[in-house]
Design a protein with these regions (language model features):
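Conserved Walker B
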Residues: 143-147, 175
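Conserved alpha-helical scaffold flanking the Walker A/P-loop in AAA+ ATPase domains
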Residues: 29-33, 88-90, 114-138, 146, ...
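Conserved D-loop-proximal element of ABC-family nucleotide-binding domains
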Residues: 148-150, 180
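A short hydrophobic beta-strand->loop->alpha-helix junction that borders the nucleotide-binding pocket
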Residues: 46, 102-107
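Loop/turn-to-beta-strand initiation segments
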Residues: 134-138, 163-169
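Conserved catalytic/switch belt of AAA+ P-loop NTPases
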Residues: 128, 153-167
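Flexible beta-alpha connector loops of hexameric P-loop NTPases
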Residues: 108-117, 144, 188
């Protein structure tokens, strides 16, 4: 998905009624940098897949592109004061803000699943223009794991000579595969796995009709990564887990049932 003026069919980035939380280290770092005038134009968000890196980057974009001050916060513990009814933040949530570009692998005609070099080149042009609403221009690449070396090299010039009032959030689950020159020009913030309770809360908010038992199983199996928990739920992998546990705790192992489960 790409979000920018003129891009077709933008999709909502996140639901402000169910905002991400639990990563105050990142949100506090962004706030401190902006308020202290020490803004790193490139931010590299690392951590396990599904832990919420993209969601936190989108939330930071909503905060950066807000148009009024003094609103109530999405989540009290994050310190990021934004209101989903703020004009700028609302456009970010809906995926329509002209000063936000989100780059993800294209779905059509993209067997490799990679972010294409042309997408990175469009990013260069996007950040080179003045903000449409007079504030910042923000871009999110989700994720750098799908950017090849040519794309990373094209991105490097942006990181070396960033235009004024631009922020670039790079998402990476495998940052060690990135060129050292890219990593060295970014402020690196690790987004760790959530604790069990925070993970359960996020999964429960996303699946309000599910039982508490299933929510607990999904949170435990995901190891603190809510995105992974939702993927497990979609594939019904947690059902296999519960069936296997039930078989293995029987006084006598039902080898036939176990063999059927493994098929």
């Amino acid at each position: 998905m790409k979000v920018a003026a003129g891009i077709e069919d933008p999709q909502p980035l996140f639901d402000p009624s169910r905002p991400p939380f639990g990563h105050a280290l990142f949100t506090d770092a962004v706030i401190s940098a902006i308020e202290g005038g020490r803004v790193a134009h490139g931010w590299l968000l690392t951590g396990p897949q599904g832990v919420g890196k993209s969601a936190m980057a989108c939330m930071a974009a909503a905060w950066m592109l807000r148009e009024t001050e003094g609103q109530t916060s999405f989540v009290e513990t994050t310190g990021m004061v934004v209101d989903p009814d703020d004009p700028g933040s609302n456009l970010v949530c809906k995926g329509h803000h002209p000063d936000l570009l989100v780059i993800r692998p294209e779905i059509k005609d993209n067997k490799s699943g990679q972010i294409k070099l042309d997408q990175i080149r469009k990013l260069v042009g996007f950040l080179g223009h003045k903000p449409g609403r007079g504030g910042w221009r923000v871009a999110i690449i989700d994720s750098m794991d799908q950017v090849n070396r040519n794309g990373a090299n094209a991105l490097l010039k942006l990181l070396e000579e960033p235009p004024e009032h631009t922020l670039l959030f790079l998402i990476a689950s495998r940052p060690g595969r990135l060129p050292p020159t890219v990593r060295s020009r970014c402020r690196v913030v690790r987004i760790p796995a959530l604790d069990g309770e925070n993970c359960k809360t996020i999964v429960a908010n996303a699946m309000p009709e599910e039982s508490e038992g299933r929510i607990s199983d999904l949170a435990r199996l995901s190891e603190g990564a809510p995105g992974r928990a939702l993927s497990l739920a979609a594939s019904q992998s947690d059902d296999l887990y519960r069936t296997a546990c039930a078989l293995l705790t029987e006084p006598r192992l039902d080898e036939g049932a176990l063999a059927a489960l493994c098929e």
